[in-house]
Curated annotation (Swiss-Prot):
Organism field: Histophilus somni (strain 2336)
Protein name per Swiss-Prot or TrEMBL: Anaerobic glycerol-3-phosphate dehydrogenase subunit B
Keywords from the UniProt entry: Flavoprotein, FMN, Oxidoreductase
GO cellular component: glycerol-3-phosphate dehydrogenase (FAD) complex
Matching NCBIfam families: glycerol3P_GlpB (TIGR03378), PRK05329.1-1 (NF003718), PRK05329.1-2 (NF003719), PRK05329.1-3 (NF003720), PRK05329.1-4 (NF003721)
Lineage: Bacteria, Pseudomonadati, Pseudomonadota, Gammaproteobacteria, Pasteurellales
Entry annotated with the keyword Oxidoreductase: yes
Recorded name of the encoding gene: glpB
Domain of life the protein comes from: Bacteria
């Protein structure tokens, strides 16, 4: 039996969920086709709006950097919408996540620094409030004595490496940074198998099997005279309640730093967005994968998925939020890069020819890779094109869109939410005209 919705969204990451939430709030019936974990489950817990220009110049605020971005990279999705539109959507997203209680700090008006797990300082827009952050203009970090606590036998977080790198920054040269390990004998079973000694498994054991008082005492003892305590993000799988309780009971200034994936901070954020979408009445088709579409008269009529290969899924509008190569939203064959479901028109930047594989990569591994700027081409309404013609009811949001390198510029999350909210607005407007 065929299913029909107002809107079908392909992809359950930040872009797909943001778009779905906005549409559900407006009374639309949405379904998200979700194939596996999203990139949020591997993220740092911070969201970037714009951190750097293509010429390498660091950005303090989006408003300050926009004109240079437009001059240097006119194909960037932000430049299709204009400065004021991007700022408006960034503000709208901040209001949305405040309502959801996503536990983040930051503002679209000004970037801030977050401390990275390797002891770096990264410019970003929004950060989970459990992560150590500081204002861009602060000369010194707010505490002089920092203790970095690891977990004995846990190699996805290296306290000594973090401490040695952090002290190199001018903002931390006044700090005394010490390191120590939590022993936690309750984790001995996990230590026997390194594959199982990951943040998710640690969190599950700590929440459900550990005597809480003993954990509090061990953290207090290992912290010494530290004024700020940095911990690996292994304390609270589904939400931040367990970590907040630890902070309260220890009486210490505890901070979490994301570990190697999976990232508990990203998992928590993804779960909150997903739960809110479902609370609004949205449907999530988990473990399913969109395979192909039927397009007639420049409109998508239906799509077929791995679990619905005989009966299509119908909708008035479709949103492609399937992510980039990491999520298989984009794929490569020998002679070209393509989007596999609709095979729509692609775009890159000046360094890449989509149909010439010799231009897809840079010689230096650590250099920005041209293929990372490849993606689908959109117009100012986030609509897609096929053979140069607009598909009227097909929109794109997030990292599946091309024309920019999200890793190089630090703008992946910003593009995701701005395009998601823009697509939602245009879908609502189109349905209201009918």
């Amino acid at each position: 039996m065929a299913m029909k919705f107002d809107v079908v969204i392909i992809g359950g990451g930040l872009a797909g969920l943001t778009c779905g939430i906005m549409l559900q709030q407006k009374g639309k019936c949405c379904a998200i086709i979700n194939n596996g974990q999203s990139a949020m489950n591997f993220s740092s817990g911070s969201m970037d709006l714009l951190s750097q220009l293509p010429n390498g110049e660091k950005i303090n605020s989006f408003e300050q950097g926009y004109d240079s971005l437009e001059e240097q990279l006119p194909n960037h999705p932000y430049c299709l919408f204009g400065k004021q539109h991007v700022l408006q959507k960034a503000k709208q997203f901040e209001q949305l996540i405040e309502k959801i209680n996503l536990n983040v700090t930051g503002s679209y008006k000004q970037n801030h620094f977050r401390v990275t797990p390797l002891g770096g300082l990264h410019r970003t827009w929004l950060s989970a409030d459990c992560i150590p952050t500081m204002d861009l203009h602060d000369e010194h970090f707010g505490y002089q004595k920092i203790t970095v606590l690891g977990i004995e036998g846990y190699h996805d977080f290296q306290p000594h490496l973090l401490a040695e790198n952090l002290i190199q920054h001018p903002q931390f040269t006044h700090c005394s940074i010490t390191t120590a390990l939590l022993h936690l004998p309750e984790l001995d079973q996990l230590r026997l198998t390194s594959r199982e000694f990951r943040s998710v498994n640690i969190s599950q054991l700590l929440e459900h099997r550990l005597a809480f008082r003993e954990l509090v005492q061990e953290i207090k003892q290992a912290s010494g005279d530290g004024e700020a305590i940095f911990l690996p993000a292994c304390f609270g799988l589904d939400n931040q309640d367990f970590f907040n309780k630890l902070t309260l009971e220890t009486g210490l200034n505890l901070y979490e730093l994301p570990t190697l994936p999976p990232s508990l901070v990203g998992l928590r954020q993804h779960k909150k967005l997903k739960t809110y979408f479902e609370k609004l009445g949205g449907f999530i088709l988990n473990g399913d994968k969109a395979l192909r579409a039927v397009i007639e008269d420049q409109q998508v009529k239906q799509i077929y998925t791995q679990l619905h290969q005989e009966h299509g899924i119908f909708a008035e509008h479709f949103v492609l939020a399937s992510g980039s190569f990491f999520s298989n939203g984009l794929v490569s064959v020998f002679d070209r890069l393509l989007e596999p479901i609709f095979d729509v028109d692609m775009i890159g930047n000046s360094m890449i020819d989509i149909q010439n594989r010799l231009t897809w990569t840079a010689r230096r591994f650590s250099s920005p890779q041209p293929y990372q700027s490849a993606g689908v081409a959109i117009n100012s309404r986030c609509q897609l094109k096929k053979s140069g013609q607009i598909i009227k009811n097909l929109y794109a949001a997030g990292n599946v869109i091309g024309g920019y390198n999200a890793l190089e510029l630090g703008c992946g999350s910003g593009v995701a939410v701005v395009t998601a909210l823009t697509a939602a607005d245009n879908i609502i407007e189109a349905q209201n005209r009918v």
